[in-house]
A protein has these predicted regions:
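A conserved mid-to-late transmembrane alpha helix and its immediate loop/hinge
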Residues: 238-246, 363, 372, 392-426, ...
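Hydrophobic alpha-helical transmembrane segments
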Residues: 80-84, 117-144, 198, 202-226
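Transmembrane alpha-helices of multi-pass inner-membrane enzymes
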Residues: 24, 47-53, 254-257, 261, ...
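Transmembrane signal-anchor hairpin modules in multi-pass inner-membrane enzymes, especially those
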Residues: 1-92, 102-105, 111-123, 165, ...
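Hydrophobic alpha-helical segments of polytopic membrane proteins
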Residues: 105, 112, 258-337
């Protein structure tokens, strides 16, 4: 990798240069794997962190300046710690504190990247996300799992509520494509050891734990006890990830990054090759998003794309783009209608009804612990006791509501303060960089602004801030935006 990509303070010694190279290599691996695997991408972040540490030892400096975000981030972390200590279930909530490490990506990106290296990483992220979108299309054509036609009375799969018409697509971490595949996988499990079954039922994907085979069932020629010959071609796409909701949120943010870069070039240079490449990538990523049939995330994407278009396009371009967004909504509606419960478009499906019931119970319990909340993940131990319906949800499906419930109303105020601060800062930075000489920085900031907008809209009805892969991507993009703006501002100061 060219040393021109590095911040200048990394060239002071061989040790600092080595650390910078390791850190940048770790971030390259992260963006390549972030749309697909949390374990591999988290490992890449650890490698990048080690590189940052080596560079710090070589330079004697973290390479960070104070920012306007530091205070609210520190206060949020401290409040989260206090909430965990005062939780209804301290042992569970304290163990959950490890999820707060995602904010490390914000400071890592700020310390390691400049606007040029940020552009390279964004480009790699878009390429990797596009590969995931293409795989989703292939996965839909190929089909997934096995559709249950008949289930025997003595089938162990009754333990997890399997019914005719359901699709079994995963046992533990292994994907299933036929009854023979299912039987072979069950025979590889240990008798008496519970495993989790991935199921698609009425268009909804759930993971149901608790399947246990007896030694006698384990020895049967067909331990599954089901008959089925077809794969499911009408499931909610999830790429190489485990769940469609995670995949949808990631596709949404990456698609808006690509769109921001494309429309920045369209505004400043017309329909050049960079615009064409970016708009093709954005279209692929949008297709991957729509195939998840996530109603709220599709709507959030359209809102985020609308913000990007409104701030970058003029005249006829706005009209054309508005029609394109209506097409996305219409196509999304068709996919939702084909994939999910027929009443999903009118919010009359069981999933929507359950969400409303859960939200009402959650709201009614916030006054019980309004300051420090009930504690992160404490509801998993008291779901039925506290009056929540069902057994598959186990969270409130709303980031603001979940934060208030888990960590108290002050945490919700801190989160709103932080989100508003990010939005206003990135919006001002994008506006000031909208000139011919800084198109790529403008595109990154514009795309990040759209991604942040969509993330916030989606957060109203999805607990996306509690999804580790999505939270990592959120903090990484905020770090890229801060790094791009800081590097751009320093360059402008030097030129003046």
């Amino acid at each position: 990798v060219s040393t021109q990509v590095f911040p200048t303070n990394a060239d002071q010694s061989p040790l600092s240069k080595l650390g910078q190279q390791i850190a940048l290599a770790g971030l390259v691996v992260y963006v390549l794997l972030a749309p697909h695997s949390i374990a591999a991408s988290a490992t890449a972040v650890v490698i990048a962190g080690i590189g940052w540490l080596i560079r710090t030892l070589g330079t004697g400096s973290l390479g960070l300046r104070r920012s306007k975000f530091d205070l609210v981030i520190v206060l949020s972390l401290l409040w989260t710690l206090a909430s965990a200590l005062l939780s209804e279930e301290p042992r569970i909530s304290i163990a959950k504190l490890h999820a707060s490490w995602c904010v490390f990506l914000f400071y890592l990106a700020r310390a390691i990247l400049n606007k040029r290296s940020a552009l390279y990483l964004v480009a790699l992220l878009i390429v990797s996300g596009s590969a995931g979108a293409l795989y989703s299309a292939f996965d839909l054509v190929r089909g997934r799992g096995v559709v249950v036609e008949v289930i025997a009375n003595n089938s162990p799969l009754h333990q997890v509520g399997i019914q005719p018409g359901d699709t079994i697509w995963r046992i533990g971490r292994r994907r299933i494509y036929s009854v023979a595949d299912l039987d072979q996988t069950l025979k590889l499990t240990q008798p008496g050891t519970p495993v989790t079954v991935g199921i698609t039922s009425r268009g909804e994907q759930v993971e149901r734990p608790g399947l246990v085979l007896t030694p006698a069932q384990h020895q049967q020629p067909s331990p599954s006890g089901i008959i089925g010959s077809n794969r499911n071609h009408q499931f909610r796409a999830s790429g190489w990830t485990r769940h469609y909701q995670t995949f949808a949120e990631l596709m949404q943010m990456i698609a808006l990054l690509a769109l921001g870069l494309g429309l920045a070039h369209l505004r400043n240079h017309g329909a050049n090759r960079y615009f064409r490449v970016a708009i093709v990538a954005a279209s692929l990523l949008t297709l991957g998003l729509v195939f998840t049939a996530m109603r709220t995330v599709i709507v959030a994407f359209v809102v985020g794309a609308g913000v990007i278009a409104w701030r970058s396009l003029r005249g006829n371009y706005r009209v054309v783009f508005t029609f394109a967004l209506f097409f996305v909504l219409a196509f999304g509606a068709v996919v939702v209608w084909q994939t999910r419960d027929r009443n999903s478009l009118l919010l009359g499906d069981p999933s929507s009804s359950l969400r409303m019931q859960v939200a009402r119970v959650g709201l009614s319990r916030i006054p019980v612990h309004p300051i420090f909340g009930h504690g992160m993940d404490a509801m998993k131990m008291h779901w039925t006791e506290w009056g929540f319906p069902g057994k598959d949800m186990l969270h409130l499906h709303s980031t603001p509501l979940q934060l208030a419930f888990d960590r108290g109303l002050p945490m919700l105020v801190l989160w709103l303060w932080m989100m508003i601060l990010f939005w206003l800062t990135i919006a001002r930075a994008a506006r000031s960089s909208a000139d011919l000489s800084d198109t790529n920085s403008y595109g990154i900031l514009l795309g990040t602004l759209g991604a942040l907008t969509a993330f916030l809209v989606s957060s109203l009805v999805n607990y996306n801030y509690g999804d580790a892969e999505v939270a990592m991507m959120f903090w990484f993009l905020m770090g890229i935006a801060a790094s791009t703006d800081s590097d751009r501002s320093r360059g402008r100061s030097r030129s003046s």
